[in-house]
From Swiss-Prot:
Zn(2+) binds at H120, H124, H130. Binds 1 zinc ion. This is Endoribonuclease YbeY. SUPFAM superfamilies: Metalloproteases ('zincins'), catalytic domain. It comes from the Bacteria. The gene is ybeY. GO terms for molecular function: metalloendopeptidase activity; RNA endonuclease activity; zinc ion binding.
Amino acid sequence: MFTIDFSDHTGLVETSWLDQIDQLLTFAKKKENIHNDAELSVTFVDKDEIQNINKVYRDKDKVTDVISFALEEDEPEIDFNDFDIPRVLGDIIICTDVAKEQSESYGHSFERELGFLALHGFLHLLGYDHMNDNDEKEMFGRQDAILNEFGLTRN
């Protein structure tokens, strides 16, 4: 089973969009060969809340579009198949204000931008990063491939 706990602090995210994000992340989980049970949370916040989270936890006093907190980061590899418990991946926090601005800037829907940011955060939870050119190419390539195969394109 794959459990995603959604929380919308903004009241801007429609239920159908949550369903689409659930389907997208479930699709991505399969594409990333995660076969065991897993869970994560996705929280939607405004600019003030994400800036505060960014300041407190990342020492960056600025607004951003998405923040991920991976629970397995810097932990030894655990084979979750040996235990009858779900793999807890972590938390994804998405700023709806920034998502709206970016969707308008890029010329695609708010719904598409929320899906993009959720997948971006999900890949961070799995260990992908974009701190250097090679990692960025790998992560963004994977992200684009999953979005395109799922059918959530920029159109």
